[in-house]
């Protein structure tokens, strides 16, 4: 029969991997640049978790007053800007969404199936800090989730196999991105030779 998948919101923000040991937190980009001092909101989110040692995968994104995502350039400027971080934070606050749990208090979770890592993440993180995620085997439910997220201003969805181990730094075959297709039907009105 149909296989259950996680239908995750595709966020157009800054992908982050966050390492915490006690009160010390380090935030890295996908290319392993450390941006800890530029994203205090991410640090605070992770310090709020009931864990001593944790490694998480997530996304930091700027939302507008209505909770809709800002263009990527707005989010991206947070790590590039030379402005004082308190000013930036007031101008463009970031929201942290966590989508995977890779290590927890001495236990590496990388080889566990995604379903188990996601369940443990949901037990650890407050509900508003986990990426919007629907687990379903029903294509119609997945379609409705996709439509709702696109209507809310997001890029689309990422479908994730629930039996897959973690693949660092790249989307494996276990992840499929789905975005709306924007097509144009055009009629040729004028042809100029020459």
Which sequence ranges carry the predicted segments?
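Catalytic cores of nucleic-acid ligases and guanylyltransferases
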Residues: 1-194
